[in-house]
Amino acid sequence: VCHSTREMQRGPVLDGLPEWYLAEQLRNFKSGHRGKNPANRAEALMGTAMAKVETEAQLAALARHFAGRKPQPYIRVVRGNIAIGRAHYATRCASCHGAKGEGKPEIKSPPVNVQEDWFLLDQLRKYANGQRSVHPSDAGGLVMKAALAGLSPGDFQNMVAYIARDLTVTPPLQKVGPPKK
């Protein structure tokens, strides 16, 4: 329920994210590097849920399960200026996340081309306002915060709109209208 494309209060779709990244994030939740900031309610819920994962084998099985699934189509909801977003992505994101948003495992940088646009926008906002990556040992989070410095909320929307339109590996999910008579 929490990590699907069903539209309700939920977390991001995890399907298709790399196993190494999922395992690393689960370990961060388990250790308290993520999920302990009360201002970030969604992560706090995940931090609590991780108490049920008792062993490294369970954690690895979860990561393997989601990594083995195909990325899910989703309804694009973030709008922005694609040209501005492309320019910001090229100068602020591509060196770590790849020209096509594929990520770079050698520097522990996840792909952004499989994630839903609403979640990417939410995470950019949380990095910028200090709700994500507040743990001092989160080097990747510190890099993210620095990369976003000086950008506006509109710039975030433009970058995410560009990613969702030009880089995503999932086709858009069309809204379903009323049945034809």
Q: Residue locations for each model-derived region?
A:
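Small disulfide-bonded, cysteine-rich extracellular recognition modules and tandem repeats
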Residues: 2, 17, 49, 96-99, ...
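Short amphipathic alpha-helical segments, especially helix-boundary/capping motifs
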Residues: 1-2, 96-100, 107, 121, ...
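Sequence/structural segment immediately N-terminal to covalent heme-attachment motifs in c-type
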Residues: 1-7, 78-102, 175-181
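Axial heme c-ligation environment in periplasmic c-type cytochrome domains
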Residues: 8-15, 30-60, 69-70, 74-80, ...
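Sequence context surrounding c-type heme c attachment/ligation sites in exported
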Residues: 8-11, 15, 19-24, 86-90, ...
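Active-site substrate-binding loop specific to GH73 endo-beta-N-acetylglucosaminidase modules
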Residues: 26-28
